[in-house]
């Protein structure tokens, strides 16, 4: 899935279907087996044994929490440590890697009951998604009013999954080349531009292999799920309480499939579609179509505030204003760094999070009035963040490419996305370029596991979804709900922010608290009215 910067309702405070993949366009994969989805039977048995070995070691060792690395710039109240996991679970005595973990201990005091003491319920482990997002800042969320009751009962635990940050980091290219700007972003690319992007995708895939070697094949979702079980053991938890957002819901669901008896409670916020036939090529086609709908929502909001922004009184007029800015930036980049690709990246964020709407509309309005400063500030590359961003993209690419078969014939990509771009031009081709290295991936592919639990196999789980989420289309929440027996789906109606847990919707948060604090869920499904739309911000006169 195409991933923007981490900004789920939880992560924000802290700071990706038309046709099936043709058989002729996919690489060979190892046969799956009941012993371990995505592997041969013998390897699956070895990986299950290796996970048990690693978890037993972690339980005996624990995590020695202490001061966090200075480079993380975390406050003193957060403590950090590491947990050791095998690079390859089929060989638990082979190469080991360390995952960085952060924690704030439960306060034990309920802020809504006069600081009345409350019992500790263990660790709440969070993953923000991506793949490639860092979870180290998650414990800071306990400072927010919406999270104080949860922070009273739970140790808030974040971590960097394998490949992220200091957790055996991946890299595929020189970070100094990562944030080059300005750059083009054609919505209907020429054949010459397509050939250029194919060449770049091949070079990027080669770079991943050259920089990581044989280790590259071990960065995938099944190993992320196994790592999570080792982390559970290292934290001293018999059963896991987990919240995943976006991609984090996918490997959380893999965990539930592989280790159902190790689950205490699980929250899936903004679920991706776990159907093995959709991981990940068809999921990205669905996502591009959903981005178009959410882009229309944003333009409709801007048009209703034409008196503030002057960008047009209809969505079509707002589109023309956007295209005018894009054409102008192609001819003369703003600040020497912001071209059409940087504009596109900034406005893609508006399809993830409503909070961006006033800022992006104001910046576009200001730019078209001859004042580019806000657009440069919001869309310009931040070179200080290049290394972190390059690392995030490398992990994203490795995990998605390793997880599943992808079409290996460029003609399949070209056919499907040319069709899609006729009706969904906003993000379709940029989504292609983000994922195209998977067509030329040098490492073996997994076969996606059949995420599924039967009645009574898994404790009840909570699924949260916004009805108009573009990054994780709502169909994914319905599919996740169908596959996890006993799960309950809470929908935020007529809303589209990507990730809704712990945000401004009190109805959603009440369901989240009731579940995590009391184990209480609605009988079947529940719906919450959507959050209020953002208020416009008037540009300077």
Predicted regions and their residues:
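C-terminal region of N-terminal signal peptides and the immediate post-cleavage residues
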Residues: 16-61
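N-terminal low-complexity, Ser/Thr- and acidic-residue-enriched intrinsically disordered segments
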Residues: 27-28, 40-44, 137-140, 169, ...
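Gly/Pro-rich cap/lid or specificity-loop segments adjacent to the active site
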Residues: 45-342, 398-400, 404-541
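Flexible "cap/lid" loop of the alpha/beta hydrolase fold
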Residues: 272-290, 363-365, 372-386
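Structural motif
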Residues: 330-344, 352-356, 386-394
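Short helix-capping/linker segments at secondary-structure and domain boundaries
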Residues: 351-369, 406-411
